[in-house]
Amino acid sequence: MNRELKTRIIVLKNQLKVFTMQTLAVTEAITTLSEAERKFGLSRSESKDFFTEWYDQLPEINPNDRANLEILWRRYIYHRSGGHLLESTVMLLLVLPLLTIAGLYDPPFRIKAEESIAINVSDSEETLQGRIDVLVLRDRLWIIVLESKKTMLSVWSALPQTLAYLMASPNSDRPTFAMLANGDNIVFVKLDGKQYAMSQVLSPLVDRGELEVAWQVLRKITHNEI
């Protein structure tokens, strides 16, 4: 292999690496909500009519799906009762089964994984370190799972990075959505143009009915909006 060809290959590899890391670099660089709003020119919508997908005209749950959601809830409660869930157990025990019951692994949906990114959250006493795992559904719905080895991070901790992911969507002319989960809580985010809004926090650990609501929101977003 001559020197010129080797040089071209190296250049192509470097270009590919830069391309695949662009979104990752942006999400790592943005650590606060004010940074995300300033960088992307975003503002939070206070209109109740902006994000109706999480509460208005939600789909009915058939008996089979309700039974599967109950099994999922009881299984998660069983494992959660043993203490804080570490590493990828939230993804394994809660998020992936929820996506399965919602039918999001079947045509026409395709799911891809983004590279995990680190997250640091500072409070008055210490800096909490964790990780964000990301799944993307048809470049319209981002599934964000927060994990921490020492303590549970609030779902709000990943909102700045989530907005960065949504802004990087190739479908910027249409609304995009995200579901943030840390195991105990789930919250949905909508971005449309330069405005965003969040749902109320759903707490499946406290109320099984809120796991059903999360399922309903997923179904509505993916089957009506995507």
Predicted features and spans:
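Central hydrophobic cores of alpha-helical transmembrane segments
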Residues: L180-N182
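A short, conserved, highly charged catalytic patch centered on acidic carboxylates
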Residues: R8, K13-P175, V187-I226
